[in-house]
Structure formats: structure tokens, C-alpha cells
Swiss-Prot record:
Coiled coil: none
Keywords annotated in UniProt: DNA damage, DNA recombination, DNA repair
GO CC, alphabetical: bacterial nucleoid
InterPro entries tied to this protein: ARFGAP/RecO, DNA_rep/recomb_RecO_N, NA-bd_OB-fold, RecO, RecO_C
Protein name: DNA repair protein RecO
Keyword check for DNA-binding: no
UniProt KW Thylakoid keyword: no
UniProt gene name: recO
BP terms from Gene Ontology: DNA recombination; double-strand break repair
Pfam families reported in the protein's UniProt record: RecO_C, RecO_N
Length: 260
């Protein structure tokens, strides 16, 4: 018979839903166990010890009772490792943060530890919390880095990127590589030279370099479409779009925050 153990680990909250009168079911991405669901009993009571630690994007230290035969574990304790207060102050940072945790929730397998992916998510949320500009650059960067961790690294070659000398080139959805306009890659998608070069930076450069990258709104939209189409091709229906549609409704109802 499988024995119950007590697990203490760092975690990022991916999502939570109300359960019953006072509880919540919370999906965590943990450093030690990967993605898993926990029951937080009494989390919705006014004086709950969980406080705000179960909100999506929270970076926490959790203690839970783990039994391998269960699909839902029992959460005992949760406290902030780092409180990302500024992340929730502006729509652009909320947008990117929610997209990141939704993507992780969609692509991670249950109880499959992915320490590199966990470190990536924490690093991205930390940067969102402190960034003053170009926070949207994090979104294509995180997607392409996560694809690499999961075994579908974009085959971006510097020589081929530099060979794109005209106004347009090609992105291969099959391997994520950039090719000149006269190339013959599998599953080609035509794009502007500016977007392909920005895509290559997001795929190969370090985070500090990516955060210094300046893109026009048109190029940014094109880069995001390239990354989205590449991941959709690689992960099929697992690639999520729920937060995108919700955020579009929010942006349509509020003045645009230009500090992106």
C-alpha cells in the first residue's frame, strides 16, 4: 500500500477554483513534484492562514500530504517565498503573467518534475515584477525557452538568420528555424525580416538581451503570431488560448496601458 508522506517544496500557483462553502482546489507547479492538484480546506474563510498565497502567479513555500494513489493532495501550509506585488499593478504584467501560468498548466504533465521549467517560470515572474518597460518581450521568450526544455528547441542558426537579407523570410513551423525567402523548409510561414530577427533573439539570447529588444507594435504582433504558430504545430491542441480571449475582453473594456 502506498504510504502518505509530507512534502515541503517551493511552488508557483497556476490556478485555483472554489470548492464547497469554504475550500479551494489549487493547481501548483512545484519544484519537487512538478504539477499537481491540492485541496486547500478552509482557504476561503476570512481568517484563513493561506491568505493570498493561493492566487495565480503566487510564488510560495507549501507543505502538503502526498499519497501517490490520489489525484488530489491535501495542502497543509502555504507562505510566500517572494511576494510579487508590482506584478499585479498593471494590465501588461498581469497579461503576461497569466499567459505564462496558463501555458505551464497546459503543457506540463501531472507529477513530472521539471526543475528547469520551474526555474524559468520563477525567473520570468520575478522579472515581470521588477521590469519598467518592454514586459511583453517576456512572453515569446518564455514560450520558446519552455519549448526547448520540453524537447522542441527552435533550430535557429545564425548563418541562416543573417541570410535573410530581403524584406521577408521564412519560419519553419516544423523545426522553428529561420530561413531566407528562397529556402525550402518544412511547413514554411512567411514573415518580415524584422519579425524573424526578433524571433531569433527571443529564441537564442539571454533574458537581459531580450528585455532590451525594441519592437514596433506591428513587429511584436508578428513575432507573437510566429511563436504561437510554432508551439501550436508542436503541441497541437495542448496550446492554450483561454487567457488570450479573456484578456482581449478586458483590454476592450479599459483604456490601454502603454507601458508595455
Amino acid at each position: 500500500m502506498a504510504q502518505r508522506s509530507i512534502v515541503r517544496t517551493k511552488a508557483v500557483v497556476l490556478r485555483s477554483i472554489d470548492y464547497g462553502e469554504t475550500s479551494q482546489i489549487v493547481t501548483l507547479f512545484t519544484q519537487e513534484k512538478g504539477k499537481l492538484g491540492v485541496m486547500a480546506k478552509g482557504a476561503r474563510r476570512p481568517k484563513s492562514s493561506f491568505g493570498a498565497t493561493l492566487q495565480p502567479m503566487a510564488y510560495t513555500q507549501v507543505v502538503f500530504y502526498h499519497k501517490p494513489s490520489r489525484t488530489l493532495q491535501t495542502l497543509s501550509e502555504s507562505s510566500h517565498v517572494q511576494s510579487f506585488h508590482r506584478l499585479r499593478e498593471k494590465l501588461p504584467t498581469i497579461t503576461v503573467g497569466l499567459r505564462i501560468v496558463e501555458l505551464v498548466d497546459a503543457l506540463m504533465e501531472e507529477e513530472d518534475p521539471q526543475p528547469a521549467a520551474f526555474a524559468l517560470v520563477v525567473r520570468a515572474l520575478h522579472r515581470l515584477n521588477i521590469a519598467e518597460a518592454r514586459v511583453s518581450n517576456l512572453w515569446p521568450y518564455v514560450q520558446l525557452q519552455l519549448a526547448q526544455i520540453l524537447g522542441v528547441a527552435p533550430a535557429v542558426d545564425r548563418t541562416r538568420v543573417e541570410a535573410v537579407t530581403g524584406d521577408e523570410g521564412l519560419l519553419s513551423l516544423a523545426d522553428g528555424g529561420v530561413y531566407p525567402a528562397d529556402g525550402t523548409p518544412d511547413q514554411p510561414k512567411r514573415a518580415s525580416r524584422a519579425a524573424l530577427r526578433a524571433y531569433a533573439v527571443c529564441a537564442r539570447a539571454d533574458l537581459d538581451t531580450v528585455m532590451r529588444l525594441t519592437m514596433s507594435p506591428a513587429v511584436r504582433r508578428e513575432v507573437e503570431a510566429l511563436v504561437r504558430d510554432f508551439l501550436r504545430y508542436q503541441f497541437d491542441d495542448a496550446y492554450p488560448d483561454r487567457s488570450r480571449s479573456v484578456i482581449a475582453q478586458i483590454e476592450g473594456a479599459k483604456p490601454t496601458d502603454r507601458a508595455t
